[in-house]
UniProtKB/Swiss-Prot annotation:
An example molecular function term from Gene Ontology annotations: ribonucleoside triphosphate phosphatase activity
Record-given protein name: Nucleoside triphosphate/diphosphate phosphatase
Magnesium listed as a keyword: yes
Species per Swiss-Prot/TrEMBL record: Bacillus cereus (strain ATCC 14579 / DSM 31 / CCUG 7414 / JCM 2152 / NBRC 15305 / NCIMB 9373 / NCTC 2599 / NRRL B-3711)
Keyword Hydrolase: yes
Lineage of the organism: Bacteria, Bacillati, Bacillota, Bacilli, Bacillales
Co-factor(s): Mg(2+)
Pfam families given in the database record: DUF402
HAMAP family from the UniProt entry: Ntdp
Length: 176
């Protein structure tokens, strides 16, 4: 597996456990790309859902993907602060087509005051049964929910106070 280069524009593909496409983001600019970490940014990019419907993101977002963790984090810059949407997912993979991951339904929404809510537990239970997630997936995801909430409390990684603003400034250099 290679990794995307700084300044490169890539698609992001989200899949379900059964291999079906879940969602595609048309264009994300890579701000940092290594074997273990990818940081990207997008603004008003086209998103295509599995049923073919499309929509456009409303605000700039910084995307954080790590090869060693079963989650990715999207920091969205809004007028009243940074909101985070965290997807419990497989670690990322990259090929010339796109940056890819498997979405495992559970999400954590983090508000500007760093309070958070675990979302979609019912969807996870349903898909776990339908797609027959192996028991090890449940163990891995529970461990990563704990890891992610620890990062939120500690303001670590993408939740660090200046993380999103710093990477957004870098993104603006590529837009001009």
């Amino acid at each position: 597996m290679g990794f995307p280069k700084e300044g490169e524009k890539v698609q992001i593909h989200s899949y379900k456990h059964n291999g079906s496409i879940h969602r595609m983001w048309e264009e994300t600019t890579i701000l940092k790309g290594t074997q273990s970490l990818v940081i990207g940014a997008n603004d008003r990019t086209v998103v295509t859902e599995s049923d073919g419907r499309t929509w456009i993101t409303r605000e700039p977002a910084i995307c954080y993907f790590h090869a060693n963790y079963w989650f990715n984090v999207i920091g969205m810059l809004r007028e009243d602060g940074v909101y985070y949407y965290c997807n419990l997912s497989s670690p990322f993979a990259y090929d010339p087509e796109a940056l890819k991951y498997i979405d495992y339904d559970l999400d954590i929404k983090v508000y500007p005051d760093m309070t958070y809510t675990l979302l979609d537990e019912d969807e996870y239970e349903k898909h776990s049964e339908i797609m027959q997630y192996p028991p090890v997936i449940d163990t891995i995801l529970k461990r990563n929910v704990a890891h992610l909430t620890q990062w939120i409390h500690q303001r670590k990684g993408p939740f660090a106070p200046d993380f999103v603003d710093m990477w957004y400034e870098r993104y603006l250099m590529y837009r001009n």
